[in-house]
Amino acid sequence: MSAVETQNLGMVPIVIEQSGRGERAYDIYSRLLRERVIFLVGPVNDQSANLVVAQLLFLESENPDKDISFYINSPGGSVSAGMSIYDTMQFIKPQVSTLCMGLAASMGAFLLAAGAKGKRFSLPNSKIMIHQPLGGAQGQATDIEIHAREILKTREQLNRILAERTGQSLEKIQNDTERDYFMSSEEAQTYGLIDQVISKRP
């Protein structure tokens, strides 16, 4: 059965390892977690953020001095969920190396830039996109006004962090995130979102 067929059936590949004590089976993600590799694939939401945060904390407890590799292929999603990942990345002792494979958009791009300086990478054909946070509110006018003010505060917070992570001016970040701003891997490197475009392992 091909990998695509396996994925369509909702199955996760299993890796069998042999040792002097016999055989042991791992799902592929658990096996990669042993190598300190974690993934964010798909939308950023409470569930995916909870899994990433738990893995970050687990790997810190395993070895607080060894880097963690964080692979990202995400269209973005919830700001609050994404910020829980961002804050945990800054909180833990190990440095987190980020790598974009495919797409890092919105909160995905924010987390890509949140990796340790000098250790933020992208594969050559990936796309990166930044924009301002989206929001929608219903209800009474006063409630809508409260939500609008909160979105503006969130935008200022995200822009300030992006300016710090990229080295761009706050004014440029504000202008560029006014609408969807797409970049190639090379453009993202020039912008300061990543440090290097890599096509092969060193």
Swiss-Prot record:
The entry's keywords: Cytoplasm, Hydrolase, Protease, Serine protease
EC number annotated for this UniProt entry: 3.4.21.92
GO biological process assignments: protein quality control for misfolded or incompletely synthesized proteins
Main enzyme class: hydrolase
GO molecular function, one term: serine-type endopeptidase activity
Superkingdom of the organism of origin: Bacteria
Record's subcellular location: Cytoplasm
GO CC entries: cytoplasm; endopeptidase Clp complex
Active-site positions on this chain: 106, 131
Catalysed conversion reaction: Hydrolysis of proteins to small peptides in the presence of ATP and magnesium. alpha-casein is the usual test substrate. In the absence of ATP, only oligopeptides shorter than five residues are hydrolyzed (such as succinyl-Leu-Tyr-|-NHMec, and Leu-Tyr-Leu-|-Tyr-Trp, in which cleavage of the -Tyr-|-Leu- and -Tyr-|-Trp bonds also occurs)
Function: Cleaves peptides in various proteins in a process that requires ATP hydrolysis. Has a chymotrypsin-like activity. Plays a major role in the degradation of misfolded proteins.
Quaternary state and interactors: Fourteen ClpP subunits assemble into 2 heptameric rings which stack back to back to give a disk-like structure with a central cavity, resembling the structure of eukaryotic proteasomes.
Family affiliation: Belongs to the peptidase S14 family.
Protein name as annotated: ATP-dependent Clp protease proteolytic subunit
